[in-house]
Amino acid sequence: LPIHQTKNVLIPRASHNFEFFAEVCQQMNGKTYPVDDKMLNYTLVQPVGVCALVSPWNVPFMTATWKVAPCLALGNTAVLKMSELSPLTADRLGELALEAGIPAGVLNVVQGYGATAGDALVR
């Protein structure tokens, strides 16, 4: 991609993903659905724990934020594995997360090939 497109479109959009999902998650709440006087149906919004995030090689920084932002905004921790064709993107995102105040261990970056590292994450 041309550098001007990356600087003027992709990076700002990636940043916006964090703002967007932070705002959306603040609006989420559990809902109750009446069934009858003996039952209660409800939704519960809570973190699921550790999320394995595998992101492709195309527009890697922005696609990584599509996965990382909602994961962290909902209170989960993440293990991010980028394509072996764009590994530095994940490293930089991890550095930026630390600079932004996200505690160490909340966003974890692993490197490797899909057949080994990616496969281990999804099993």
Enumerate the language-model features and the residues they cover:
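Residue-level detector of short coil/turn "hinge" positions at structural boundaries
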Residues: 2-3, 104
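Long amphipathic alpha-helix in the N-terminal Rossmann-like dinucleotide-binding domain
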Residues: 3-28
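Rossmann-like NAD(P) dinucleotide-binding subdomain of oxidoreductase/dehydrogenase enzymes
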Residues: 17-20, 29-123
